[in-house]
Amino acid sequence: RYDSIADAYQSGEYEKIYDRYIKSLAEYNKLSAEKKQYIGKPTEPMGKWNFRRPVGLSETMLNVVSPYTLKGFIFYQGESNTARGAQYRKLFPAMIKEWRASWGQGDIPFLFVQLPRFETKTRYWNELREAQYLTSLHVKNTGMAVAFDQGNPKDIHPIVKDTVGWRLAQMALGK
């Protein structure tokens, strides 16, 4: 699928598709504001301006702040990768390496939050937690704040976040 999108870039077709999307979005916003009729919100086409493209999040959010100096990273994410626990064993360390390289500050601290407890019928969450744990063991200057005990079996987002924040703070302060 991505190859066909990449081919559209080369042919100039993507710009035409994106222009149609922008016009449709303007029409959607106008009709929504006027509440004249319900129409479905247009979907942004996959392509070079879509943040969901490969490395899109990095290019649209991280590259704009990477020139600034920082003391370390705090990363709290992973739910969208739960079905790829085995891949995450390589992807997560690679992401850490890439972020550190983008900032050019060596092996600055990279702290992250383990996925919390969440009741699911698959083993995926456990596999991803294991990949996170292995990363904390094998990637230099990383720390994992355990969140399993803070999770809510019925809600993907723990209600009480101060314990996880405290754990991250203790690691950041070297305690």
Cite the ranges covered by each PLM segment.
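Cell-envelope and extracellular/periplasmic
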Residues: R1-K175
